[in-house]
Amino acid sequence: GFDRLIWSEHSKSDSHICLEYFSKHNDQGFPGNMSARISYAWESDRTLRIDFSASSDRETPVSLTNHNYYNLNGHQSSIKNHTIQLDANEITSIHHDFTATGDFESVINSCLDLNHEKSISALINSEDPMIKHARGLDFNYVLTKGSVVSVTNELKDLILELHTNYPGIQIYTGQHLDKPFQRYQGLCLEPQFYPCSPNHPHFPDCFIGPDKILNKFIKLRFKEGDLL
């Protein structure tokens, strides 16, 4: 994957850096000569903005994202005492092996409903069969347009707000983390196109080509909570 490759510096300043990578036709099995750029910019309101852009001379699927692990209490502690809230009424349905079925599943009034703030501990310990099978959360939520994902730490003195123009977000609670870390020591928030999008034409279009480029962003804003 692109995460294991060395990207070149395109530009930088005191508060931003832009990296680029050129993927030749049939690199990793993907058609098209593709140019990709990712920029990271630190903004004045404690916001880290990540911009993704890509263009190709042939039609090819692209879904660049960020796979950071977040822990607002510090990396030596668990994320179980965090809370999470996001505006989404559905997830993309999955088979037993976690591949997408192409259908949607309502989460309204279910254990997976995150429209109201929930503790990650309560989610992980839920008797919901899907959560038990995954041993936590590892699901793609269908974001409501303009929605915000909000994560708060145990003391409620630090809040992470995520904004994006991607149509979905994978929420993963780190249940498969291994040494030197432990399970549930980090939370992943991965804005993306829906999993398996190329195989399901009714999903939002993840293809770029000569007449269509990728322009997506992730904004991560760190806010002080009510106690500060």
PLM feature spans:
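An exposed, glycine/acidic-rich loop-and-rim segment of catalytic or binding clefts
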Residues: 1-228
